[in-house]
């Protein structure tokens, strides 16, 4: 998708920027105030110095009274020093608020992902859209980041125009004396009209040329963002990725990466970006700068001729020239800001396309009973499901009922629908056909958070965060330390926990602390299991719970898991069929359907069944 500056009207441009500004003020109140104040001081302080300098030059060119000269010098020094001091203070404040704004902007994105339906979150189109937003911001700050710039430029431009107008009025009202001869022609209204037309032309043409340059850049947005992804993946991120470093060294992947970076050539000589810089963008900006120089030259001639004719003193020359050129520059700044905003509007549109993704999953109002007897009955009734955008059914006509407090194993080949079954049970997705019932009621009628509270899940691709061990187990800042410690011991983490000097306060990983500890894949899996145990939900679901454990640790977990689970209903997904023997019931999935269901002994007795084939396929590697 190519971004075009002319894609949105001025009304739409201002509307979407007002919305963006409201959102930024909501998540970071007062965030724009230092930018406004800094812009006012930045724009106004030069005019004070210009006016004082003109008075000083007038005195130097006439009476040259020492006490008057000293007064003007002191005023110039004092005003300049005060302005610089004030700007330094405001700049500090501005930098602090800028960092806060950038951080809160990330909070806005994170909150959206957390509130979004998992089905939309998992959708590739959503991920691609968010990646595009990221690349736009990385490229040139497009999106929210430019709001700070627009506030600054708008206030600076308006303040500058008002200040310049105040200092320029007398240029056109003061007349050249009749004794000046031919120079009295400067009093003719046509000169005034001509100067004003020139100012208007430069003021309008300059921003138009700058807008043309922005438009040229925006047409390259997709290519530039792709180039950023290439550089981020192969140049910036790879060297610090220790998990990939062994493969990179062993298979000389750096050569492949270097070749790809050179082949893509988004930013190199002869690339579209380089050509745009040399042609449309470069020429547009050069012409804009040339027009400004022409205006300055004409104004200098006009002001000097009026001064030569005696309309005002020599000190006013610098005042008027600076004021007129600054007036034009600030007006151009305002217009170019509008052009820039029209370009940025398309990038904000992408952001709000993401932020406005609606939650379509039905939110029920019933509460799940907090049953002390944990008597929860779950039934899949003719459930069928396919992932968004897919024509293939991931699950088809699944019927199953859980026996409360029992152990259920789910087995099957890769892609048979095992993990999809768990996602539907946890209501990460809703089925297209059929119903999932909790105690006879469709789970969609329950409050979502309430329903989620009855499940503890260890997904195969679980994540631990760089925080203390106890916080990882509890999932909160405040927690029951004895309960967290017991969960870790039950999960088989006792020996490693005893070896940690800080115990539950041990920071995991070194991303945020040099004192952090690294844990192996098996140890991380034990922590994830402990996290599920700590939640103490009626249902505990383990997706490949021992995949990263060695056989001894696996045997230890399974040997005591019946005791650990207690009266909970436990559901396991496993490729190691030896782990299924301790389960009360086994469901065999194949191509999205449940084709067998029974105990280990019952299923193994069916020599023509899928379970028997899977069992013997694995058993041959453990027997001679």
Regions found by a protein language model. Give the residues of each.
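Extended non-transmembrane interhelical loops and adjacent amphipathic helices
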Residues: 1-18, 99-145, 224-273, 345-358, ...
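Primarily ABC-family ATPase nucleotide-binding module
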Residues: 249-254, 352-406, 486, 563-566
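Helix-to-loop junction immediately C-terminal to a conserved catalytic motif
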Residues: 426
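C-terminal portion of ABC ATPase nucleotide-binding domains
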Residues: 502-503, 559, 576-624
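ABC-fold ATPase nucleotide-binding domain signature/coupling loops
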Residues: 437, 494-527, 536, 621-624
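Cytosolic ends of transmembrane helices, especially the final helix of ABC transmembrane type-1 domains
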Residues: 299, 318-357
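Transmembrane helix-loop-helix hairpins at lipid-water interfaces of multipass membrane proteins
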Residues: 32-89, 157-214, 298, 305-314, ...
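Membrane-integrated ABC transporters
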Residues: 1-46, 66-72, 90-94, 123-162, ...
């Amino acid at each position: 998708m190519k971004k075009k500056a002319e894609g949105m009207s001025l009304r739409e441009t201002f509307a979407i920027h007002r919305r963006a500004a409201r959102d930024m003020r909501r998540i970071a109140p007062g965030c724009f105030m230092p930018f406004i104040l800094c812009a006012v001081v930045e724009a106004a302080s030069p005019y004070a110095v210009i006016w004082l300098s003109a008075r000083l030059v007038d005195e130097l060119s006439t009476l040259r009274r020492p006490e008057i000269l000293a007064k003007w010098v002191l005023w110039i020094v004092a005003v300049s020093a005060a302005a610089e001091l004030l700007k330094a203070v405001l700049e500090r404040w501005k930098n602090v608020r800028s960092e806060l704004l950038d951080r809160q902007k990330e909070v806005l994105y994170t909150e959206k992902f957390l509130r979004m339906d998992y089905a939309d979150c998992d959708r590739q189109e959503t991920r691609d859209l968010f990646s595009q937003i990221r690349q736009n911001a990385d490229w040139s700050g497009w999106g929210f980041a430019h709001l700070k710039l627009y506030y600054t430029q708008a206030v600076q431009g308006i303040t500058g125009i008002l200040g310049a107008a105040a200092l320029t009025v007398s240029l056109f009202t003061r007349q050249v004396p009749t004794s000046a001869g031919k120079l009295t022609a400067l009093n003719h209204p046509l000169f005034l009209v001509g100067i004003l037309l020139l100012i208007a032309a430069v003021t309008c043409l300059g921003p138009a040329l700058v807008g043309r340059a922005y438009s040229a850049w925006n047409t390259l947005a997709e290519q530039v963002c792709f180039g950023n992804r290439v550089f981020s993946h192969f140049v910036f991120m790879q060297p610090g990725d220790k998990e990939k470093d062994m493969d990179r060294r062993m298979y000389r992947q750096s050569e492949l990466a270097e070749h790809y970076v050179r082949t893509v050539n988004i930013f190199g000589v002869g690339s579209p970006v380089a050509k745009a810089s040399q042609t449309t963008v470069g020429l547009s900006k050069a012409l804009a700068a040339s027009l400004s120089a022409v205006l300055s030259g004409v104004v200098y001639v006009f002001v000097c001729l009026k001064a030569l004719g005696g309309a005002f003193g020599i000190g006013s020359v610098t005042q008027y020239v600076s004021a007129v050129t600054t007036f034009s520059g600030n007006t151009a700044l305002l217009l170019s800001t509008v052009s820039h905003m029209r370009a940025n509007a398309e990038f904000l549109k992408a952001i709000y396309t993401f932020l406005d993704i609606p939650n379509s999953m039905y939110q029920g109002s019933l509460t799940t009973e907090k049953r002390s007897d944990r008597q929860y009955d779950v039934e899949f009734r003719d459930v069928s499901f396919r992932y968004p955008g897919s024509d293939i059914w991931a699950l088809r006509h699944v019927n199953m009922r859980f026996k409360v407090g029992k152990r259920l194993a789910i087995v099957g080949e890769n892609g048979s629908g095992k993990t999809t079954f768990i996602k539907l049970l946890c209501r990460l997705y809703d089925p297209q056909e059929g119903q999932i019932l909790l105690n006879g009621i469709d789970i969609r009628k329950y409050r979502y958070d309430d329903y989620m509270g009855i499940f503890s899940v260890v997904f195969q691709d679980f994540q631990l965060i760089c925080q203390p061990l106890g916080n990882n187990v509890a999932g909160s800042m405040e927690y029951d330390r004895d309960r967290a410690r017991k969960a870790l011991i039950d999960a088989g983490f006792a020996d490693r926990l005893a070896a940690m000097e800080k115990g539950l306060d041990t920071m995991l990983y070194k991303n945020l602390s040099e004192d952090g500890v690294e844990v192996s894949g098996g140890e991380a899996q034990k922590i994830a299991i402990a996290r599920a145990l700590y939640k103490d939900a009626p249902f505990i679901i383990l997706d490949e719970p021992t995949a990263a454990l060695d056989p001894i640790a696996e045997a230890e977990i399974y040997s005591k898991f019946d005791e650990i689970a207690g009266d909970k209903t436990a559901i396991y997904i496993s490729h190691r069929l030896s782990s299924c023997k301790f389960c009360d019931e086994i469901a065999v999935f194949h191509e999205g359907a449940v084709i067998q269901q029974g105990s280990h002994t019952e299923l193994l007795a069916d020599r023509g069944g899928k379970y028997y084939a899977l069992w013997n396929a694995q058993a041959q590697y453990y027997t001679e």
